[in-house]
Structure formats: structure tokens, C-alpha cells
Amino acid sequence: MAINIVAQNKKARHDYEILEKFEAGIVLSGAEVKALRAKRANLSDAFCRFIKGELYLMNAHIAHLETANKYFTPDTRAPRKLLLHKKELEKLYVKVHKDGLTIVPLMIYFNERNYAKVSIAIAKGKKLHDKRADMKAKTLDREAKTAMKNRSY
């Protein structure tokens, strides 16, 4: 059984160098889970931050589902608590505060047991010349593949 990807943060892979990945649970209300199942989420400007020793997903947009509750509209960009083991939290805290790295959400998905999970990563920001070098390498690879594909014997 495969995972069901809800939202991906493609901008994170472009702007950051991914060093290490983690899988975290996320605290959601029932209406938010319904919205995720309808794939109404966006991680483009999302980031993670420590608040009182706990890790929160900030600025992630989970849209309000019209059929869920008409009388209560929650904040779509509310901070959402991420669930990790204590040792993982300590490791992330050290990496962020001592090494100056950032924690970036990569995707929200439902795992095999239908639990909503967030894939987060410890990342280091790329400089402009690094981004250009990556884009150049990708275009060269793409051109080489098309040349090999169109090659006649």
C-alpha cells in the first residue's frame, strides 16, 4: 500500500539543500483532516519553529471545507503542533539553534495506516550561484537524456 501525497513543497527543494529528513505526526481537527483528504492544502510558504520546546508547523495553509462546519471557520494558517519523539526534538533543536540550520516541511501525506504525516527536513539555505549550478546540471542531464533517446543507430 502506497502513501497518499496531499501537498508538496517544491520550493523547498529549490531554495534549500536537504541534509536530513524526518517524519512527524500532526495535530489536526476533524474538519482539517477532511480538507486534507480533499487535497486542499498548500505548503509553499510554510516553515517550522520551536515554541516552548515543541515544534510547530507555521504558515501552512489548510483550507476550510464548506461541508464540514458552517458555523465555525477556523484559521487556515494557524500553527499546528508536530509530533516527534523527544530525542528527535532535541536533535532538531540543537541543529537549529547551534548550527544555524532551518527546518522545512517537504510534504503532507497519509501513510499506510491513514494517519496524516508531515515530512520535514533539516536544511541549509542555498546561495544564488548554487541554485544556478543546480539548474544548469538539470538542463544538461535533460539534454543528454533526450539526445540518447533520439539517437539513431
From Swiss-Prot:
GO terms for biological process: trans-translation. One of its GO terms (molecular function) is RNA binding. InterPro entries: SmpB, SsrA-bd_prot, SsrA-bd_prot_CS. It is found in: Cytoplasm. Keywords: Cytoplasm, RNA-binding. Pfam families: SmpB (PF01668). GO terms for cellular component: cytosol. Required for rescue of stalled ribosomes mediated by trans-translation. Binds to transfer-messenger RNA (tmRNA), required for stable association of tmRNA with ribosomes. tmRNA and SmpB together mimic tRNA shape, replacing the anticodon stem-loop with SmpB. tmRNA is encoded by the ssrA gene; the 2 termini fold to resemble tRNA(Ala) and it encodes a 'tag peptide', a short internal open reading frame. During trans-translation Ala-aminoacylated tmRNA acts like a tRNA, entering the A-site of stalled ribosomes, displacing the stalled mRNA. Belongs to the SmpB family. This is SsrA-binding protein.
